[in-house]
Amino acid sequence: MDRIKKNFGFGCMRLPMIGEEVDIEQTKQMVDAFLDAGFNYFDTAHGYIQGKSEKALKTCLTSRYPREKYILTDKLTANYFKTEADIRPFFESQLEICGVEYFDFYLMHAQGLVNYDHFKECRAYETAFELKKEGKIRHVGISFHDRAEVLERILTEYPEIEVVQIQFNYIDYDDPAVQSRKCYEVCRKFNKPVIVMEPVKGGNLVNLPENAKAV
């Protein structure tokens, strides 16, 4: 497994904006500070910021640093393919947009009961494993949003999955809708490394209400 330095990632679902466009100069400063601090893991998806996240990463990261300097995760999202034949061209377009020849991690995005059936019908997992054999993906994983029993089914049916991204924070730990703890326990059962998303719940866990700030 590629070495993720200091176990901390730069998520690109949200980036600084000027109006409707990514603030490129501020994002460059953030990327530089992140790498200078010894971190190296970046996470994006094609739909983030209406397709602007991947483009910003090419401008701010991949065109400015050698490939070995960073670890890049991208994702396959259900609404970008209808058939198996759609997947490979979409993947190749992601490589081009991001300005790289391979992804360190490629995740089947937002897996849950409904999405998973679509991915299975279109042989998305099989296509990803083929791309890994071709050297265009180093590690295949999933990002997951559903009940623990669904996660167990996926990991049973596709033991080749190498890593699982789950929502994990103290609010969602025992939330019956999110089931962070139970999902984490399933990952442990199957000996799968975990990548945490939403550790501060989109900033909500660090944005104090006014009455708390006054204390």
Give the role of each language-model region.
Residues M1-Y70, E101, T127, K133:
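N-terminal binding-site loop/beta-alpha segment at the start of enzyme catalytic domains
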Residues K5-G9, N40-Y41, K69-K75, Y102-L107, ...:
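Structural preference for beta-strand elements that scaffold enzyme active sites
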Residues M13-E25, K75-A85, V114-D117, N211-K213:
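Active-site mouth loops of central-metabolism enzymes
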Residues E21-F34, K82-G99, D146-T156:
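Short, acidic/polar
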Residues V31-D32, E54, K58, R88-L95, ...:
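Generic structural signal for well-ordered alpha-helices
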Residues Y48, R64-A85, H109-A110:
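Structural motif corresponding to the early beta-alpha repeats
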Residues L95-N115:
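Active-site groove signature of glycoside hydrolases
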Residues Q111-V215:
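Beta/alpha (TIM)-barrel catalytic core signal, keyed to glycine-rich beta->alpha loops juxtaposed to Asp/Glu
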